Amino acid sequence: MIELGNKLLSLDLFEKKFVCNLNACKGACCIEGDAGAPLELEEIDILEESLDVIKPYMREEGIDIIEKQGVFYMDDDNEPVTSLVKNGACAFVYFDKNNSTKCSIEKAHSEGKLNFKKPISCHLYPVRVKKLRNYEAVNFNHWDICSDACTLGSELNVKVYKFLKEPITRKWGEEFFTELIQIDTEIENENLKK
């Protein structure tokens, strides 16, 4: 782990390679798992206030569950996460003509109907952020459904943090991303000395 301000960064951010390969996985991270996508409190408000522009892109079962229980529920760690439909898929998922999962929130954003792109936890995936007492732990989430993305990342030689430049900058700012580049350079220089 590398300490940067109030963040503990996994070395995997700099050592692992990753590029989402939706052609291979079909967006499985949006439909598999044991809980919905983590939400920040302000994101709950945004989703609740934006439902009218998001609903036209949602599946009926997603709309039904949100009308019954709301846009989120509390997971086993007592953290807010997106609501799920019966099969475990995120309530905001819809499927395109290739049967790949798509996000109704992101669709509303791409069509100019919403300023909010999607929850930051979704945007940052495969990185997960865990709030600790005095730190945020920033870790690469190893999940077999992303093995094709790791393979593609290796083929294209794209490190996890570089693949995630946009969401990292969205969450922590441009200066933070610049610091990641500096850390990466230091790690590479140390590896050359070995």
Show the residue positions of the predicted features:
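Short loop/turn segments that flank or connect secondary-structure elements
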Residues: 1-194
